[in-house]
Amino acid sequence: MKIINMKKISILIFVICFMGALKAQQLPQITQYMNNNYAINPAVAGMYDYYQINSTIRNQWAGLNEGPRTSIISIYGKHNSNVGLGGTVYSDVTGPTSRMGGSASYTYAFPITQKIKLALALQAGFTQFKIIKNLRAEYENDPFLKGGDVVEALPDATFGVNLSGNNWYIGAAIPQLLSSELKLMDDDFARIYDTTSQNGKLASHIYILGAYTYDINSQISIEPSFFLKSVAGVKTQIDFGIKSEYKKLIWAGINYKMNNELSSMAALFGYNINDRFNLGYSYGIPSSMTSNYYSGSHEFLLGVRLPH
């Protein structure tokens, strides 16, 4: 019975934290946003003259049992001179809670000047939330442990805008545009555990993302970038990054994340193969406050450029 109670407490903590996260940054986090910007803003699909497939796998708290694990696969690119198309599927798992979804996007781009282009995008799809209750209770009347998994599926949408030039871009996106209401706890759970609300809301976020590529010479370039994330009631989070590329073959960079009172840093490395494949890796360095609990974060990216 002691084991069951410990598992029960563990699940309860995850659920309460999960519901609490509905008031904070709710969406999967990635470090290599500059290499997978479509996962942030669907409007960038109109910025490229080719189709790209990106796959990202992230283990956010390595060494911590049942820490966040994220997988994202995206395909996007220019369909014709004005239209960009794209699609994404993803999975985000933390302990007994999971979030998965899929979406497709349509982007329309048009020139502002000879060198500057504006793109507008609408992305639509679904999101499924799940709490796994795979425990057996000794007492049949246990209101939380009895019954099956909790599953809730909701429609989702994102609006994006992107302004781009030859070597720069800046854009904004509003994910979770519909602000759908989410119910993961039944009435018995809410009553017995005295939760203040059994409902959560998928709050609309505001993302602003930009980058500029500067060629130092014919072999070396640098790319500073930033990624701002904002949601009502939560302090704005800002990521600053810079990467340097040599002969368009290998690159390295750093990313600095400012999040409330807790900041963090990540090191990034990558390799481009024949202008068709690119590999990326980032290591999130744990802060002095968290190093006793986990050994950092690992994120891998594989990109494939398709011939148009």
Name the predicted role of every residue range.
Residues 1-9, 112-114:
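Positively charged n-region of N-terminal signal peptides that target proteins for export
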Residues 9-19:
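Sec-dependent N-terminal signal peptides
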Residues 18-26:
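Sec/Tat signal peptide C-region and signal peptidase I cleavage site
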Residues 25-308:
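Subset of outer-membrane beta-barrel
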Residues 1-4, 14, 55:
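A detector of low-complexity, intrinsically disordered, Ser/Thr/Gly/Pro/Ala-rich segments
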